A protein has these predicted regions:
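C-terminal, surface-exposed recognition/capping segments
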Residues: 1-167
Length: 167
């Protein structure tokens, strides 16, 4: 864990990565298994209702509303894959990372990403531009980076994330 002098410590690698410049694995929000293709139809928390898809967990508005807005540990990929002392950041913790660190585009081991340096203590982490995965597979590697938080957005079809581009 890297101490950036913020409210939480940050991992030195992505989930599934060995080195900081490794992309790691891709996951849908609230899922703990990676896939080669990501669609609404194969999303863990959707259920087919004829022609429609219905969200069945982490729902704040529908008929299955459970009003859960933070991932449970069993649905938090960092907790499941990295161990019980790990979890994904909350939206507020991600905001703190953005606001209390200096972000600089760098290349590390041939991989573009951001060196995120704490304005509090000078320690840093590297966040690779790992892109994303969708119905067409992996996209925008070395161009963009997207990182989930544990926090559900007000619309249950969306979750808070932080993202960046090479520009």
């Amino acid at each position: 864990a890297v101490d950036l002098g913020l409210s939480v410590k940050w991992a030195s690698t992505n989930v599934g990565a060995v080195y900081p410049e490794d992309f790691g694995d891709y996951y849908a929000w609230g899922e703990t298994k990676s896939k080669s293709v990501y669609t609404y139809e194969n999303y863990r928390w959707y259920e087919s209702a004829g022609e429609l898809l219905d969200i069945i967990k982490y729902d704040t508005k529908g008929e299955n509303a459970d009003n859960k807005t933070i991932l449970q540990k069993s649905d938090d990929v960092a907790n499941v894959k990295m161990g019980r002392f790990w979890r994904m950041p909350t939206a507020n913790e991600a905001k703190e990372l953005v606001e209390k660190c200096h972000w600089e585009v760098v290349t590390r081991g041939g991989v573009k990403g951001y060196r995120v340096t704490s304005l509090v203590n000078g320690n840093s982490i590297f966040l690779p531009m790992a892109g994303y995965a969708d119905k067409n597979g992996e996209q925008d590697e070395n161009i963009r980076g997207f990182y989930w938080t544990t926090s559900l957005y007000t619309d249950p079809l969306k979750a808070y994330f932080f993202g960046f581009t090479k520009d």
